[in-house]
């Protein structure tokens, strides 16, 4: 809720290619500069639908939530992040088959609500 961590997500297009991105940004407490700490995305066969308006959400300030600790399955490469005020969390998981998942949760004053849940299928093996 204090603005020191943010997440952006949206569509990208490059020529005939389409996809999406999700990026987690963290403010340097000394310099004030925002730098990315997680960048994720994938290509899509069809572009995401364009929203009528840009959407914004902000965590509720006040009592801090209890943040559950998650563990990955055996073989998962997992990273977990938490904003300093504990109102925004993110989890990045890469499974042994190279499928990926990024989940972002935001404190609404009562619960940590999932606001982004990106799942990417494993890559298709190249045909010989």
Model-derived features with residue positions:
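Short beta-strand edge/turn micro-motifs at domain boundaries
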Residues: 18-53, 101, 105-124
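Pro/Ala/Gly-rich low-complexity, hydrophilic intrinsically disordered segments
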Residues: 41-75
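Surface-exposed, charged secondary-structure patches
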Residues: 1-22, 66-95, 118-128
